[in-house]
Amino acid sequence: ERRCDPRRLSDCEDFVRGRSKGGRGEKECRLSERCCTELQKMPRECRCEAVEGMYKEAERKERGEGEQRQRLERARALPGLCSIEPSYCEIRPS
């Protein structure tokens, strides 16, 4: 189902990868807001599935570089960060 496509979480992927262009702080905040908007548009029942797919795609792009644990924790906590249900996604590390 297209509405559950992990590719619809592109801002979330950037956020999980820590790709706020130009440093931390305010930009990252805006990025997380855009990510929350993407997540809210998804049907509740497939949010975690989409988040997991997005996380695996982020890992593929990063090829295990850098802060894998941090990316995993960020991905798992995304719905909670956005104050939407379910508040936590159980993602199996790749």
Swiss-Prot record:
Keywords: Disulfide bond, Protease inhibitor. Pfam families: Tryp_alpha_amyl. Disulfide bonds join C12-C35, C36-C82, C48-C89. GO terms for biological process: defense response to insect; negative regulation of endopeptidase activity. Expressed in seeds (at protein level). Gene3D superfamilies: Plant lipid-transfer and hydrophobic proteins. Thermostable. Active from 25 to 100 degrees Celsius. Retains 80% of its maximal activity after heating for 2 hours at 100 degrees and retains around 30% of its maximal activity after heating for 4 hours at 100 degrees. It comes from the Eukaryota. GO terms for molecular function: cysteine-type endopeptidase inhibitor activity; nutrient reservoir activity. Optimum pH is around 6. Stable from pH 2 to 10. PANTHER family: 2S SEED STORAGE PROTEIN 1-RELATED, 2S SULFUR-RICH SEED STORAGE PROTEIN 2-LIKE. Belongs to the 2S seed storage albumins family. Cysteine protease inhibitor that likely functions in defense against insects by inhibiting cysteine proteases in the midgut of herbivore insects such as C.maculatus. Selectively inhibits cathepsin L, as well as papain, ficin and bromelain with lower efficiency. Shows antitumor activity, inhibiting the growth of prostate cancer cell lines PC3 and DU145, and the gastric cancer cell line Hs746T. No activity against cathepsin B or serine proteases (trypsin, human plasma kallikrein and elastase). This is 2S albumin-like cysteine protease inhibitor. The lineage of its organism: Eukaryota, Viridiplantae, Streptophyta, Embryophyta, Tracheophyta.
